[in-house]
Regions:
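N-terminal secretory signal peptides that target proteins for export/translocation
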Residues: 1-16
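Bacterial N-terminal signal peptides
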Residues: 23-32
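Second-shell loop/turn segments in exported
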Residues: 36-37, 53-61, 98-106, 110-113, ...
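A short alpha-helix/helix-coil micro-patch that ends at or immediately precedes a cysteine
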Residues: 37-77
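Short, surface-exposed glycine/acidic/tryptophan-bearing loops
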Residues: 66-113, 126-128
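Disulfide-stabilized extracellular recognition modules
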Residues: 105-156
C-alpha cells in the first residue's frame, strides 16, 4: 500500500514543547542504542540499491522518520493487517515539503522490496527524485512475518 501527502512548509506549526522534549529523549535513546536495527539498515540498503540501479542518489536516514516507521511497523504486526497512518506528518516537529509511505509484509525483506518495486505506486515513492530522507521500520512477528514501513520525506 502507498500513501503520499504534500504540504507547504508554511502550513505546519511546531510541535508542542512536551512532544519536542519526548522526541529529543527518543532520539538520544536511539543514538545510544546504536541507531537503527540491523533489519532496518538492511531494508534501507535495499531501497538505496533500487535507487542506485535507476540512477538516483541514496536517501539519508532521518532518525525521526525511523522512529515513526519502527513504531508503526510494530503496530501493524500487532494489528495483523496492513493499514496506513491517517496523518503522515504526525510526530514530525519540523518543516517538510512532501511525505510518502510504503507498507508491506512478507517472508523476507528482499521479497517485500521486490513486491514494492513491482507495484507502480510503491515504486514511485522509492524512485521519487524529490525525496531526500528515509526511515524504515521492520518488525518480525511471532510467525516469522516481516512487517515493513518505509517513510519518505523531502526536506525544505
Amino acid at each position: 500500500m502507498t500513501h503520499r501527502t504534500e504540504s507547504s512548509t508554511t502550513s505546519r506549526r511546531r510541535a508542542p514543547r512536551r512532544l519536542a522534549v519526548l522526541a529529543a529523549v527518543a532520539v538520544a535513546l536511539v543514538v545510544a542504542l546504536g541507531a537503527c536495527t540491523p533489519e532496518s539498515n538492511r531494508a534501507t540498503a535495499l531501497v538505496n540499491e533500487s535507487r542506485a540501479a535507476n540512477g538516483l542518489p541514496a536517501l539519508g536516514v532521518n532518525i525521526d522518520l525511523y522512529l515513526i516507521a519502527q513504531g508503526y511497523s510494530g503496530t501493524l504486526a500487532n494489528d495483523g493487517y496492513l493499514h496506513h497512518r491517517t496523518n503522515l506528518a504526525e510526530g514530525l516537529g519540523y518543516p517538510w515539503v512532501k511525505l510518502g509511505e510504503n507498507i508491506g509484509k512478507g517472508g523476507s525483506l528482499e521479497q517485500i522490496q521486490n513486491a514494492f518495486m513491482a507495484s507502480p505506486a510503491h515504486r514511485d515513492n522509492i524512485l521519487d527524485p524529490s525525496f531526500d530522507a528515509i526511515g524504515v521500520g521492520v518488525t518480525r512477528d511471532a510467525n516469522g512475518v516481516y512487517w515493513v514501513v518505509q517513510e519518505f520525506m523531502n526536506q525544505p
